[in-house]
Amino acid sequence: MRKFEYTVRDALGIHARPAGLLVKLAKTLDSEITLSKGDRSASATRLMALMNLGVGQGDVIAITIQGGNEARSEQVIASFLTEHL
């Protein structure tokens, strides 16, 4: 299991466009990816669950990666977050 945190920089937080791209990306990876904010969490493959986290600009999210090639999945997700959020 790998974990890391990311501070959201996008002015709109996690909204439809980047959430949709994240879901599409997560479905191509062989790891289970979960995003958490506070005591709420959501699978990175579920669009509405991600949007319901209510992540805004400046919020810190925790990303947990389990199974498959965790190191590769972490690199891919970290790169996506930096580029899109």
Walk through the language-model features, giving the residues of each.
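Compositionally biased, low-structure terminal segments
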Residues: 5-7, 81
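Intrinsic-disorder/low-complexity, polar/charged segments enriched in Ser/Thr/Lys/Arg/Asp/Glu/Gln
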Residues: 1-5, 60-62
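C-terminal structural segments of small proteins and small subunits
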Residues: 51-85
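Compact, glycine-rich, soluble single-domain proteins
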Residues: 7-48, 52-53, 57, 65
